[in-house]
Amino acid sequence: MIGIFDSGVGGLSVFREVRKVLPEESYIYYSDNANCPYGGKSKEFIIDRARKITELLLEKGARIIVVACNTATAVAIKTLREEYPAIRFIGMEP
C-alpha cells in the first residue's frame, strides 16, 4: 500500500498521477485539513504532524509514503527518512 499525505487536498493531484503509473496498488490518502495550511506553522509543529501522520499510515499498512506537500517535504522529510530508515519516502523535491 502507498500512503500519501498533504496538509490539504492539493495532494489529490499527486495521488491521481501516481495511480496512473501504479494502478494495481492500494492507496490511502490523508489530508490534514484541520491544520491546513502548514506554511505559517513552526518547524516543530510540521515535523510532529508528519510523524503522527506517518505512524497512522504505517498502522494502515503503507509501505511507501508520498509527502505530497511542499512545506512538509522541505521541513520534515529528512527527519522522517532518518527516523524510519526502512520506509521509502517520496517528497515534492525539485
Language-model-detected regions and their locations in the chain:
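Non-catalytic structural scaffold of enzyme domains
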Residues: 1-94
